[in-house]
Amino acid sequence: MDRFVWTSGLLEINETLVIQQRGVRVYDGEEKIKFDAGTLLLSTHRLIWRDQKNNECCMAIPLSQIVFIEEQAAGIGKSAKIVVHLHPAPPNKEPGPFQSSKNSYIKLSFKEHGQIEFYRRLSEEMTQRRWETVPVSQSLQTKKGPQPGRIRAVGIVGIERKLEEKRKETDKNISEAFEDLSKLMIQAKEMVELSKSIANKIKEKQGDVTEDETIRFKSYLLSMGIANPVTRETYGSGTQYHMQLAKQLAGILQAPLEERGGIMSLTEVYCLVNRARGMELLSPEDLVNACKMLEGLKLPVRLRVFDSGVMVIELQTHKEEEMVASALETVSERGSLTSEEFAKLVGMSVLLAKERLLLAEKMGHLCRDDSVEGLRFYPNLFMTQN
């Protein structure tokens, strides 16, 4: 902690903000200190921590002081962390929260997630070392005399340790990749066999394709629909997470919406998405928050809330006039229909069928008969006949 210096938190000339994350706690080695909940900012030149309650409490450490970084997975009751190993503090360091520290590393605990994306961006900055190619004002430089080079400060033991960490990380990534590939090959083999069976039955016209086989076939396709689901661990718990989730939802919902006439209830969407995400289940609250951003991001699907409070997802090209005209035509052909009867005819849920009929009634094309036998809709003859 003695490497940190007090700062205003303002970016210097030629310094660029890379990423920021709320809810980050700073540890001095393994020790908890008073810097509990703050916003961690990564720029091209510094790591900046600002207290969320007291914005005047702001400290920073130059990226040039970092030797290497490593991830620490979350545990039971423990948040995921990034461990930052540091060079020794220069003798002429500017004032900071600590004058001395026995630890050569700090830990950054991410209480609101987002550590995966932050670690990736920090690793990129450490590799690119843009603070060397794009100098900033002298106020950022914590040294006035010559600073030891990176290799000299680390030492042979430090270099060997860093190489060993990289080797372990590479081995882990390779093992996970082969494990995922094996699972994919097993699932792909089953899917190919099933698809051949269905194709042969259709081609030879011998027997009908059973509903169970169709469901199995679609489930394999759906389970492989989201290769890399958006998670809080990757994007944190704020607006960025819901924006990325909204973009992914638009991608996976467009085809199912087209199959279902351009509209689905939010309940159907919730089941469909969580089935595709596998173990990375989505909460109803996150789904609603992401869907609220669909239209603002100009995506091909949008959230719609009916007067009754029912929420649906529909295609941007889905036209209300065509939907009402279709409902009027169907009811006119049958003379009158209940929501259940209309749902069976058009092949949609009773909930959506009722909302479509109510919308047609609201626009004056249908009228209702609400009796002990239930709610029944009729064509509004006052609108269709002179």
From Swiss-Prot:
A Pfam family of this chain: EAP30
Disulfide cysteine pairs (residue numbers): none
PROSITE patterns registered for this protein in UniProt: GLUE
SUPFAM superfamilies membership: PH domain-like (SSF50729), Winged helix' DNA-binding domain (SSF46785)
InterPro entries: GLUE_dom, PH-like_dom_sf, Snf8/Vps36, Vps36, WH-like_DNA-bd_sf, WH_DNA-bd_sf
Record localization: Cytoplasm; Endosome; Late endosome; Membrane
Oligomeric form and interacting partners: Component of a complex at least composed of ELL, SNF8/EAP30, VPS25/EAP20 and VPS36/EAP45. Component of the endosomal sorting complex required for transport II (ESCRT-II), composed of SNF8, VPS36 and two copies of VPS25. Interacts with VPS25, SNF8, TSG101 and CHMP6. Interacts (via GLUE domain) with ubiquitin. Interacts with RILPL1 (via the C-terminal domain); which recruits ESCRT-II to the endosome membranes. Interacts with ECPAS.
Family: Belongs to the VPS36 family.
Record-given protein name: Vacuolar protein-sorting-associated protein 36
Organism: Rattus norvegicus
